[in-house]
Regions:
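Short, amphipathic alpha-helix enriched in basic
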Residues: 259-270
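Short, Lys/Arg-enriched N-terminal segment that forms or immediately precedes the first helix
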Residues: 78, 243-248, 287
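N-terminal regulatory/effector-sensing and dimerization cores
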Residues: 67-178
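Amphipathic alpha-helical segments enriched in hydrophobic/aromatic residues interleaved with Lys/Arg
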Residues: 157-228
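Generic protein-terminus/edge-of-domain signal
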Residues: 1-104, 110
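Basic/polar phosphate-binding segments, predominantly the helix-turn-helix DNA-binding elements
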Residues: 235-242, 268-288
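N-terminal positioning helix adjacent to the helix-turn-helix/winged-helix DNA-binding module
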Residues: 199-202, 253-261
Length: 288
């Protein structure tokens, strides 16, 4: 199992090292300020811990039989350089464990708080800020892998006496297999309906089991990993735990913003102030 730690390296050096050693492959696109992320393994799990007060950010990356520990000083040239937006070759999940994460999606900027989650299909351009204090889990799943998860889920749904309500996460995975929707830019906003700590208590055992299975990859691990992912996606798509909003990023800016505001007001039962909306959406209160 390969391990490495990167300290204050340049962007070029980082790309070169990752391309040589890492299942996460980052390439610069022809367009300026844009990168493309690909993965060479069925899935990648990343845990990002940012501590601005301690001037560092740790990225722990797990994939089958592979582990990387990347450390960035927040005062380094790499950390201070504006991150280019990127696009994935696969679906990406972001779940905020603690603190808040600022996410740039196209020309919009949003803040996700602890307990909130977003799922993006492969056509969404975005980037996260390495700033503030937060901890978040990122899951990247190849198309072939999600297809297997979907097949298993649909088989269970077909044979159970009480099928579940529509799971929007598995629906997004199904849409990725649909050629007529291959160019749609869709992501899901997931806001907790119950206390974030209660959700994390249920998710943490699955996150831990997934990481342990990944770094101790052995016979049967692929089956166990699929089972854990299926349970994770079922929980994240549970309508009793999350209010999930399906958003098309190619909507006009005002329509896109309206969808976000509507979802926030719905999940907060109308108790979100204009100042709180300013913080979450990075817009002037008068404009909102």
């Amino acid at each position: 199992m390969e391990k490495d730690a990167f300290y204050n390296i340049t962007r070029k050096e980082k790309v070169q090292i990752e391309s040589a050693m890492n299942p996460l492959i980052i390439t610069d696109a022809k367009e300026p300020d844009f990168q493309f992320y690909d993965i060479s393994s069925p899935f990648v799990v990343m845990l990002e811990t940012c501590r601005e007060s301690d001037n560092n950010c740790h990225i722990y990356q797990f994939s089958p039989d592979n582990y990387h520990n990347i450390e960035l000083g927040l005062s380094s040239n790499f950390a201070l350089t504006p991150r280019p937006q990127h696009q994935h070759s696969c679906i990406e999940f972001m779940y905020v464990l603690s603190g808040s994460v600022t996410n740039h999606v196209g020309n919009q900027i949003f803040t996700y708080e602890a307990g909130q989650c977003c799922i993006m299909n492969k056509n969404i351009r975005h980037c996260e800020d390495f700033s503030g204090d937060f901890q978040a889990v990122f899951l990247m799943l190849q198309d072939d892998f999600t297809k297997e998860l979907l097949t298993d889920y649909e088989e269970i749904q077909k044979n159970t006496k009480q099928p579940e309500e529509e799971n929007l996460i598995f629906q997004l995975i199904a849409d990725e297999q649909n050629e007529t929707l291959q160019f749609d830019k869709i992501y899901l906003d997931c806001f907790p309906l119950i206390p974030a700590d209660d959700i994390l208590e249920r998710l943490s055992s699955l996150f831990n089991a997934l990481v342990l299975e990944t770094i101790n990859w052995d016979f049967g691990s692929s089956f166990l990993a699929k089972a854990i992912f299926t349970r994770l996606l079922r929980l994240l798509g549970d309508s009793s735990m999350f209010s999930i909003n399906r958003i098309h990023s190619h909507s006009q800016g005002q329509e896109f913003l309206f969808n976000k505001i509507s979802h926030i007001m719905k999940t907060s039962h109308g108790r979100c102030t204009r100042e709180e909306l300013e913080t979450l959406l990075h817009y002037n209160g008068e404009y909102l």
